[in-house]
Amino acid sequence: VVQTAGNGYLCDQFQNSKVNLRTDQYGGSKENRARFTLELLDAVIAAIGATKVALRFSPWGTVLMPLDADPISTFSYVLGEVEKRGVAYVCLTQPRTDLFLSENVKWANLHDAVKDGSMVAKVEEINLLPFEAMLKTTPKLSTGGYDGKNCFEEVEKGELDAITFARWFIGNPDLVEKIRLGLRLTERNVETTYSNGPGGYTDYPVGEVV
């Protein structure tokens, strides 16, 4: 079971200091804002065991909500608590990626947040290293902005245990084989990604598309 604690979903809303305005035990401090995520995690672990549970976080995410005021502090705490629980793995979304924004726009927005003081961080700290450091024994995965060329380095260096793909699988039913052979990947048709029926979803050809 993958508990989605990122991308603007419910756990992420509780964790976010600019969205969670509660004044009870689930709001205010980072510990309180993490309470819902951790209580949910503990309930799932109690039901099926920690080794069958994984989590996904997007510390630098801005999907349908503002950037957290202090992502490093907020998510370092949450991940430190997750580390204690011995889950199967944690997948972290790269800061460069966003569901609705281009990579250039996302980076510009993050840099602007540093400059105007709406986020506590330095430009050089906008990466996953602080969060990876909290996961000393938990397998670390990452997603967002990877392709057939840049998907090896972090694993080969030992910084990550694996990287994951999502969008590329839509346009490339033979994604693994294409990466293995170094073939050009096919871009998905964004306009049909969320439409009904197989068109633009399960009808992409295999091999390189000219």
List each language-model region with its residue ranges:
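Flavin-dependent oxidoreductase catalytic cores
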Residues: 1-210
